[in-house]
Amino acid sequence: RGGFRINVLPPEAECLVAGLSADAARPYCDRAAAETGVRYELREEGDSLHILCRGKGAHASLPEEGVNAITGLLHLLCSLPLAKVGSTAALRALSALFPHGDCAGKALGIAQSDELSGALTLAFSLLTVNGTGLEGQFDSRVPICANDENCRAAAEASFSKFGFSVSGEMDAPHHTPADSPLVKALLKCYEQYTDYKGECLAIGGGTYVHDIPGGVAFGCCMP
C-alpha cells in the first residue's frame, strides 16, 4: 500500500513479501535504489519480508519535483524473484502503465501538451493491495487540448488491455482567455500598483475558481 491523498505524490509505500529474506532481497533493493532514487528499508517478520519505500512527496500538479514511492515499490517488486501468480502479474501490469519517472502519462497513452497550458502531468497517488484484488488512484492535470476521447477513453483502453476496470469522471480543463475584460482589468491594476509587467500564468493546480466560468485565480505575487 502507499499514499495518503490523491493530490499528493506519495512519499512512502510498503508491502509484505512472503518467502523472501532480507539478504536475498538486498542486492535487488540496492540496484532499484540507484535506478529510482527511492530508499528501501527491509525488516524480516517471521517468514515474510516487510519492505518500506521512502521517496519524496510533492504536489500532484508538480510530480517531477518529487520521487514517487509507489512506482518505486512497483519497480522493485518487478525485479524480485517472486512466484508468477495473479497478484504479481497485476503488479507488473501496473508498473508497465505507471513506470517510475513517467510523469507525463506516456505509458498510459495520454501524454499531450499545448502552447497555452503546457504538458499533461500524472501522479500515481494511492494504491492498496489485499487478498482479493487491488485498487489505485491517480491524479492527472490536463492541458486545454485534453478531452474525453484523447484522455479518459485513451486511459481506459490502456487499462483494459491488462484487465483493469476504471471508475471516476474527468473534469474538463479550465481556461479564461488573456484578452477577457476581467483579465485585462486585473493586469492593469497589477501593473498600476506594482510597476511590474503583468502576465497570465497557466498552472496545474485547480484553485477554487475552476468551476466559475470566465474566472481566474488572482492575488498578490511579486516576480
What residue ranges belong to the model's regions?
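Short linear capping/connector segments at secondary-structure termini
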Residues: 166-172
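Short glycine/threonine-rich loop-to-helix capping motif typified by GTGT followed
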Residues: 10-13, 175-187, 214
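Redox- and metal-dependent alpha/beta enzyme cores, enriched for Fe-S-associated oxidoreductases
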Residues: 148-164
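Short, contiguous acidic/charged loop-to-helix segments that flank catalytic cores in large enzymes
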Residues: 141, 172-177
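Ordered, soluble secondary-structure elements with a strong preference for glycine-centered loop motifs
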Residues: 63-64, 146-149, 177
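Noncatalytic alpha-helical scaffold of FAD-dependent oxidoreductases
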Residues: 83-84, 155, 159, 192-193
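Midchain, well-structured core segments that form catalytic/ion-binding scaffolds
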Residues: 1-143
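Zn-dependent metallopeptidase/amidohydrolase metal-coordination segment
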Residues: 130, 184-223
